[in-house]
Amino acid sequence: MAKASTSGASRVRKKVKKNVSDGIAHVHASFNNTIITITDRQGNALSWATSGGAGFKGSRKSTPFAAQVAAETAGRVALEYGIKTLEVRIKGPGPGRESSVRALNALGIKISSIADITPVPHNGCRPPKRRRI
């Protein structure tokens, strides 16, 4: 008969909160959604939020207001880690580009720089066909 072990299985590791003063906010603004990830300088994620995760579904996910709400959500969690300054890197052509940066600024986080890192093809893949309405 196997003996039930009492040590080891019941121990739960306490999550350690890092104290980070500056970090990087990665904003991925696609046409359908906006994803905001706040990392430390090494690239370890501290917090993240999406427009869909903020409660918006369908075409409302792709609005600037949805990106603003998502940025506020990610920013509040990052403030608990002690974030004071952020370097913002924006990727994508979506409508949530500017409003997400404004929302982070309104939380009291100092934005040191804004960089557009949208990948531009050197005539790579064929783009989607034009919409006809």
Curated annotation (Swiss-Prot):
One Gene Ontology term from the biological process aspect of the record: translation
UniProt keyword terms in alphabetical order: Ribonucleoprotein, Ribosomal protein, RNA-binding, rRNA-binding
PANTHER family named among the record's database cross-references: 40S RIBOSOMAL PROTEIN S14/30S RIBOSOMAL PROTEIN S11
Organism: Bordetella petrii (strain ATCC BAA-461 / DSM 12804 / CCUG 43448)
GO CC annotations, alphabetized: ribonucleoprotein complex; ribosome
Classification via InterPro entries: Ribosomal_uS11 (IPR001971), Ribosomal_uS11_bac-type (IPR019981), Ribosomal_uS11_CS (IPR018102), Ribosomal_uS11_sf (IPR036967)
Disulfide bonding pattern of the chain: none
Gene responsible for this protein: rpsK
Protein name as annotated: Small ribosomal subunit protein uS11
Family recorded in the similarity comment: Belongs to the universal ribosomal protein uS11 family.
Purpose: Located on the platform of the 30S subunit, it bridges several disparate RNA helices of the 16S rRNA. Forms part of the Shine-Dalgarno cleft in the 70S ribosome.
Superkingdom field: Bacteria
